[in-house]
């Protein structure tokens, strides 16, 4: 699993923000802005993209020649107009899966990515974790501990204009002035590596 929000040079990532000082978090905003551009580029909206029925557990034959579109508005509060939450100390991050040619999820419900504080103390300080994705993209995203990469986006076969599914993670109002460690993992895929990062809002 790949955690997307900045150039990652090691296995542990720190998001550090000084509240109200944009220079301290513009690097994260810029990285997220660049990420969402692949979904907003009109040239990407070709005949090979289609609207998908995410309530169906059946693998459609068309998946092998086309791919599902991903509506960037599904990011809900994690959007450009809100500067991805960094202005009000509720930073957003993006979780994606690496593209593996021909791979299919074992579960017909897709792949779940779950996140929580790394320790009980972190869980007390973390505030609220909200997951916005193709299935849930409103306040209900704050009532769960996992987001979903729907199975309809797989397999990846180098389709034209393929748009990988994303899960937008909002860390809503975490405790300030303390380092908070967060772990994310794939819930229904054993033997996959966890992603760990930390947030510090001064």
Regions found by a protein language model. Give the residues of each.
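Extended, solvent-exposed segments with strong compositional bias
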Residues: 124-164
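Eukaryotic intrinsically disordered and solvent-exposed regulatory patches
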Residues: 78-82, 153-155, 168-170
